[in-house]
Amino acid sequence: MTALIRIRGARTHNLKNLDLDLPRNTLIVITGLSGSGKSSLAFDTIYAEGQRRYVESLSAYARQFLSVMEKPDVDHIEGLSPAISIEQKSTSHNPRSTVGTITEIYDYLRLLYARVGQPRCPEHHYPLEAQTVSQMVDHVLTLDPEQRYMLLAPVVRERKGEHTQVFEQLRAQGFVRVRVDGELYEIDAVPTLTLRQKHTIEAVIDRFRPREDIKQRLAESFETALKLGNGMASVQTLDTTTATPHLFSSKYSCPVCDYSLPELEPRLFSFNAPMGACPACNGLGVTEFFDPAKVVIHPDLSLSAGAVRGWDRRNAYYFQLIASLAKHYTFDIDASWESLPEEIRHTILFGSGDEQINFTYLTEAGGRTKRKHRFEGIVPNLERRYRETESAAVREELAKYVSTRTCPECGGTRLNRAARNVFVADRTLPELTVLPINDALEFFKTLRLSGWRGEIAIKIVKEIGERLGFLVDVGLDYLTLERKADTLSGGEAQRIRLASQIGAGLVGVMYVLDEPSIGLHQRDNERLLGTLTRLRDLGNTVIVVEHDEDAIRQADHILDIGPGAGVHGGEICAQGSLEQIMAAPRSLTGQYLSGRRRIEIPKQRHPPNATKMLHLRGACGNNLKGVNLDIPEGLFTCITGVSGSGKSTLINDTLFTLAANEINGASHPIAPYASVDGLELFDKVVDIDQSPIGRTPRSNPATYTGMFTPLRELFAQVPEARARGYSPGRFSFNVRGGRCEACEGDGLIKVEMHFLPDVYVPCDICHGKRYNRETLEIRYKGYNINDVLEMTVEDALKLFEAVPAIARKLETLVDVGLSYLKLGQSATTLSGGEAQRVKLSKELSRRDTGHTLYILDEPTTGLHFYDIEALLAVMHKLRDAGNTVIVIEHNLDVIKTADWVIDLGPEGGGRGGEILVAGTPETVAAHPHSHTGHFLAKLLPPKDVSNCGHRNPKEEVDIAKTVHR
């Protein structure tokens, strides 16, 4: 087998006919500017060809079930292995997917509980064990031989009646004593029982002192008792009947209530199977309900003015119901909802119960008619309409008022009562899945089961332990197995898939990864790199697209693509060892690695104003422990901490949702907190995340940034367009008129090929240009609308520099490092980092008041050192205009340039959720228990760290005292 992967003539996207050789079975890092062509080489060329060749080796029948990748634009590749791609895409949007299910650990847990689990009665907590007569006798012989005992057989349990027939049958069978409701009687002296009261009747089978010489007699007595008691028997002291009885069962059931289970199966522990799922929530762990907080959208308004949408004066039918209610209960329909008595509000929302109310209805003829009936209530009315409607539009409209809450039946565990009451080492399956992975691993390391259970469990526990260990190795020890897959970040999802691949133990495979270090603290980086080298050492080729300095330094082979982005990239600037990259004059990466270029620390940090602070008190969502957060206004603040320490919960789920609801009038669910103060300092809050800017190929940077509207207006003002009477709508590819109707403005026609990949061919009418011939005849400075959409931002800026409405938006795209993007590039082809920067550009192009609160979550994703430098300039520009910028970030180059750093920790999950230190980067670097500070100290001048910053240490402490809780 060849020792090299030979690539000849790679021209995918912006690659410029690359010829290169990559060593197999090594760790290869591909780096370079954002948009330089790294992903085009790694994913769209190497991975695509490896995957395509493997799939094409399968039968035509098998191929129709697999998505076959498009053949990359390359002359020749040899030395490829079957390829596995691990990208930064959210794992699943299925609400049933959890960390446990996607790693398959949950499958092993189900098997473990089915094979060695100990079921217990949910009511009485007795183990459900079937015992033999010998086991029962042996147990009785261990009791106190000085005590007198009686053996009882339950005949009637908690049933109403006089039960005269039961006593007659017992008498006929020769029994002389019975116990009725806990009292002993001779069978002929039993009092008449109360007919309407529940009774328990037990036959006394034998009375004895436990001694070895009565073993045979006891065995016969037990057989009689079990036959009479339908498999149940109990032993009770004769002298003190208040003592706890010893219960026995020959069936797999509870000796008290006869609760039983069939044989345990793995399906019983699956929340995706009817056998195991909670019947109330169908295994989802949450139930949907119409939320009064969403139904009453304006509690400050009156019912007549629109407190509840659709039940005000504008809707005659529903308003006449409210008017009749007001008359019956004597409340004012013009009074605000908040001022109405609680019982009145409850009646309006949930109905009048059994109380009949006189309602006045308007007839079609304009008259009035009266009817007396109960009031249904607004919430039950919505529930009924949601249930009965067949209209998707009505259902979608009503869904706006629906919220979810933890299922009251299963408490969010998703499993039914039987599955929730099976134990291994005194822990149920739901109790295990809520443990952080680190703690779960510790549980299995110390798990000791005796006898046959231990023999069966040993192999299953080994598999579970290995898989949990892999998750710990990739820095995910803070996650829980019940965590929903759709709540994971892209980086977490990618590392979970990476852990699964290590678990698979494949050899001779080519792995292609996209920035696995995203969302990972520097402390966990070493473990991740250890994981990658372990994959390599198994005999695999590991190709990583990465910007992290540690990863680049640890690579066996480095490939630097550039020199610029987009059309200015696609070339190999340098390749080889770390030393070769650092020495290469054309390598921008080498310049940063060697220290010839660096991101500078600001000469002067902006001090916080203790009188202008945003104070958030008592934040306790997820793992936060009553955190008190203080954000200085008008500064660039970094939120740091190890993965899972609570950064996203504190900023995204608490601060942003709270500020957006208060300032922007949004209605996001807010994580729990005590109080907030200082929101009046801001007039707008903007969250810039990495979600896509559009989910269809029709979305693009021009439409998202709002540039397409002035563009279309400009083309409509061209003399030829005015002469033809064309409006701006003529130049939209989304509506009829100017677009090509053959492809409906897509420019491509989809041809389904069944077992081959779907083929998208250029429309043969417009030849991929989206517009009809008449529209394309309109030109501005020699370019038609399609030519403009095909331009890069950089070229378009030269063309439109005299048009302020367009130029301003183009300039901000250049500022955030997206000069290489095409204006009409499909939003679905943008990476998460590119999408985030398009959003940032849109915000920058708006006129800001200098009182905006910007929140960014890991904006350096996908960014090279050079791109980070440009991004920091943009964020400092926002800060200098008076805005407040909050960034959740692990990148040390960003953290060291911040004005203020708030470090959470000390660890992830349950061992995190506290603010360790708040202050300048120098203050954080000097903190002895801060993981961030430990790594940050290496980048700051030693004198600064020891002095805790450029200011007087006393002044620093005073500010920190004011700011920090």
UniProtKB/Swiss-Prot annotation:
Organism (species): Xylella fastidiosa (strain Temecula1 / ATCC 700964)
Role noted for this protein: The UvrABC repair system catalyzes the recognition and processing of DNA lesions. UvrA is an ATPase and a DNA-binding protein. A damage recognition complex composed of 2 UvrA and 2 UvrB subunits scans DNA for abnormalities. When the presence of a lesion has been verified by UvrB, the UvrA molecules dissociate.
Oligomer status and interactors: Forms a heterotetramer with UvrB during the search for lesions.
Pfam families documented for this protein: UvrA_DNA-bind, UvrA_inter
Keyword DNA-binding tagged: yes
Chief location: cytoplasm
Domain of life: Bacteria
Protein name (database record): UvrABC system protein A
